[in-house]
C-alpha cells in the first residue's frame, strides 16, 4: 500500500500532531540505565489520534522518556494514518506498520541490548485499538516470506491499553475512529475482524487496561 501523500504535521500546546504520513518510522529512545548482564525490557509506544492523526509528543515521545526513567527502552511508532489512505488500504496500513515495527525491534534486540522476550506494546485511544489489534492479529514469523524481516515474530509479549478504543461494533464503538479506519459503510467482516474483544485467542499476550470515568 503506497500513497502519493505529502507529509503533514501540525503543532499545538502538546507538541506535534502528525497527519499525513508517507514513510512509517520508529523513533528509538534507549534507556541509559544499565544492569550488569541483564538485557532491558522494551515497549513500542503507539500514540492516539482517532486514526486521523498522531499525538506524537503527548502520547508518544513524552511516554518514551518516562519509560526510560524506569530503565525501559522505548520506540515510538509513526505509522501511516488510515483516514488519509485509499479505500483499499486504509484498514491495512496501521497494522502492517505496527507488525513491521515489532519485527524490527525483536530482530535487532541483541544489538540494542533488549530482551527479545520482554518486548511489549503500549497505546492510547485509537493507538490503544492498534495495540489490541497487534496483540490479537500477530504471527510467529512468516517462514515463506521473501522479506527476511518478516520471518521474525510480530507478537508482543504484553500489552498496555490506555483509554483504548476496543470494539468496532455499535453501540460501544467510537464511531469517529471506526469511520476513519474502516470507511463510511464498512462490511460486517471488517467490523468483526477489528472488534478485538472478539479476537482474543490462546496466544494473545497478557494485557492491562486503563480507563477513567472521564473517558
Functional labels for PLM-detected ranges:
Residues 4-13, 164-199, 205:
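Mobile cap/lid helix-loop segments that gate and shape the active-site cleft of serine hydrolases
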Residues 203, 208-215:
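Short beta-strand/loop motif that positions the catalytic acidic residue
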Residues 39-48:
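Short beta-strand element of the alpha/beta-hydrolase
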Residues 1-28, 38, 89, 175-177:
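A domain-start/cap signature at the N-terminus of enzymes
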Residues 49, 73, 78-82, 165:
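Short beta-to-alpha linker loops that shape the active-site pocket of alpha/beta-hydrolase fold enzymes
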Residues 55-56, 62, 79-116:
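Catalytic nucleophile-loop/oxyanion-hole region of alpha/beta-hydrolase
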Residues 56-76:
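Short amphipathic alpha-helix adjacent to the substrate-entry channel of hydrolases
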Residues 100-177, 191-192:
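Primarily recognizes the serine-hydrolase "nucleophile elbow" in alpha/beta-hydrolase
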Amino acid at each position: 500500500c503506497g500513497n502519493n501523500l505529502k507529509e503533514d504535521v501540525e503543532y499545538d500546546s502538546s507538541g506535534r500532531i502528525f497527519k499525513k504520513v508517507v514513510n512509517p518510522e520508529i523513533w528509538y529512545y534507549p534507556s541509559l540505565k544499565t544492569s550488569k548482564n541483564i538485557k532491558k525490557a522494551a515497549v513500542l509506544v503507539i500514540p492516539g489520534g482517532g486514526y486521523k492523526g498522531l499525538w506524537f509528543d503527548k502520547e508518544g515521545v513524552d511516554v518514551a522518556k518516562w519509560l526510560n526513567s524506569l530503565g525501559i527502552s522505548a520506540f515510538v511508532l509513526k505509522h501511516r494514518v488510515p483516514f488519509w489512505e485509499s479505500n483499499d488500504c486504509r484498514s491495512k496500513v496501521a497494522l502492517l506498520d505496527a507488525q513491521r515495527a515489532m519485527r524490527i525491534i525483536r530482530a535487532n534486540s541483541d544489538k540494542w541490548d533488549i530482551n527479545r522476550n520482554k518486548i511489549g506494546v503500549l497505546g492510547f485511544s485509537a493507538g490503544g485499538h492498534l495495540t489490541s489489534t497487534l496483540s490479537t492479529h500477530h504471527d510467529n514469523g512468516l517462514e515463506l516470506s521473501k522479506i527476511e524481516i518478516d520471518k521474525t515474530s510480530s507478537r508482543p509479549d504484553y500489552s498496555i491499553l490506555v483509554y483504548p478504543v476496543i470494539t468496532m461494533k455499535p453501540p460501544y464503538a467510537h464511531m469517529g475512529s471506526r469511520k476513519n479506519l474502516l470507511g463510511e459503510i464498512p462490511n460486517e467482516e471488517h467490523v468483526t475482524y477489528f472488534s478485538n474483544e472478539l479476537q482474543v485467542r490462546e496466544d494473545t499476550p497478557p494485557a492491562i487496561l486503563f480507563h477513567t470515568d472521564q473517558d
